[in-house]
Regions:
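Bacterial N-terminal signal peptides that target proteins for export
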Residues: 1-13
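Bacterial N-terminal signal peptides
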Residues: 10-22
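A short aromatic-anchored loop/beta-hairpin motif
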Residues: 25-199
Length: 199
């Protein structure tokens, strides 16, 4: 397990994430979605991104960029945590909010009892320290780990959609957790552009 100081810092950081994510377990009139940035969306962070997004109570949304691997891995982040050394995949940049916190997306068929919350079909999100550690230790082959998340204030994502910045698609666990993300954005953009042209 990570050292006591690391656990304390991660637990402290999780408090702000919990503020946004705890309400995601409540029923909302919207479904999770996969956002694919359009070619015209020129932004240094969100241009050419794919974002798994979910509504939360109050009209806001939270999400995770799924195609921005970093050069950092779990072993570098937690050098004293032996299970982290076995995870070869890089950490991904989930977004610019709470970048000091590690989140885990894990594919699960059925329900979970470890505090992870459903975020999309067959996908659960863990942000509490113990739940993330458990996934690192025993489910890393079916998970992806992120630094940070995306947060939209109430109405903010609706405005971005009205401005035509995003394509919207249904999230699929296999696509969201695809190991090789090079070319994934271009693949989805081409598919969604073709779909839009047939409507």
């Amino acid at each position: 397990m990570p050292g006591t100081k690391v656990l304390f810092l991660r637990a402290l950081a999780a408090s702000s994430a919990a503020f946004f994510l705890a309400s995601a377990t409540a029923a909302t009139p919207e479904e999770p979605m996969l956002l694919v940035a359009k070619r015209s969306f020129e932004d240094p962070v969100y241009g050419s991104t794919i974002v798994l997004a979910r509504p939360v109570q109050g009209g806001g949304h939270v999400g995770f960029i799924v195609n921005k691997p970093t050069k950092l891995n779990l072993a570098e982040l937690f050098p004293e945590h032996e299970p982290s050394k076995k995870v070869a995949d890089p950490l991904f940049l989930g977004g610019t909010v709470d970048m000091n916190l590690v989140f885990a997306l894990v594919e699960t068929h059925g329900s979970r009892k470890d505090g992870a919350i459903p975020i999309a079909p067959d996908l659960f999100l863990a942000y509490e320290t113990k739940a993330v550690d458990r996934i690192i230790e025993s489910e890393s082959d079916h998970a992806r780990f992120f630094l940070g998340m995306v947060v939209w204030r109430p109405g903010q994502l609706d405005d971005e959609l009205d401005r035509g910045l995003w394509f919207v698609d249904e999230p699929e666990a296999k696509l969201v957790l695809r190991r090789k993300t090079d070319g994934l954005w271009e693949e989805l953009v081409r598919r969604l552009e073709a779909r839009a042209n047939t409507i």
